[in-house]
Amino acid sequence: MADNDDAAGCPPPAPAPVRRRSSANYRAYATEPHAKKKSKISASRKLQLKTLMLQIAKQELEREAEERRGEKGRALSTRCQPLELAGLGFAELQDLCRQLHARVDKVDEERYDVEAKVTKNITEIADLTQKIFDLRGKFKRPTLRRVRISADAMMQALLGTRAKESLDLRAHLKQVKKEDTEKENREVGDWRKNIDALSGMEGRKKKFEG
């Protein structure tokens, strides 16, 4: 009984620590081949479904082509009615030919208008598509070539006729004659003598020098 009481009062043993797999074990586990999950549909069943889908698509295409042929026949029967040429004279045949030519010209005009509208719509669609690509940043950037160009040619291309005026920087500078520069240098060089003369130090220097 004492043993049973001690066993009941003791806490349950802790579970064994889970051993983590090392990176090498994980790598080996990832690279080793595993059994692929079996598909619920067999290969023969897949082939049968694909064949059935192709047959349905073929029937749909044939039906659409038949509908287009029927619409074309109905349009031609309403627009191109059979001609009644029995008992017509030469003048009446000429009038009929003129009427037919007028109808042909009208149809050509309508066809031209429709083609112009279609071309305009295609151009607008292409422009909108290009704008969408530009906004998304997925447009194809053209390859740029390196071009050697001088500074003068670059300014000429940017400014045009004003390039010469802007490049002529000396025109805005003040022109100084050579005589004026010599005079300024002479005046600057004699500033010590002028100071000595004003302060009365010139005579004292002569006494020391003598």
Swiss-Prot record:
GO terms for molecular function: actin binding. Residues 1-23 are annotated as: Disordered. Keywords: Acetylation, Actin-binding, Muscle protein, Phosphoprotein. GO terms for cellular component: troponin complex. One of its GO terms (biological process) is skeletal muscle contraction. Residues 32-79 are annotated as: Involved in binding TNC. The modification Phosphothreonine is found at residues 31, 51, 78, 129, 143, 181. Binds to actin and tropomyosin. Interacts with TRIM63. Interacts with STK4/MST1. Troponin I is the inhibitory subunit of troponin, the thin filament regulatory complex which confers calcium-sensitivity to striated muscle actomyosin ATPase activity. This is Troponin I, cardiac muscle. The gene is TNNI3.
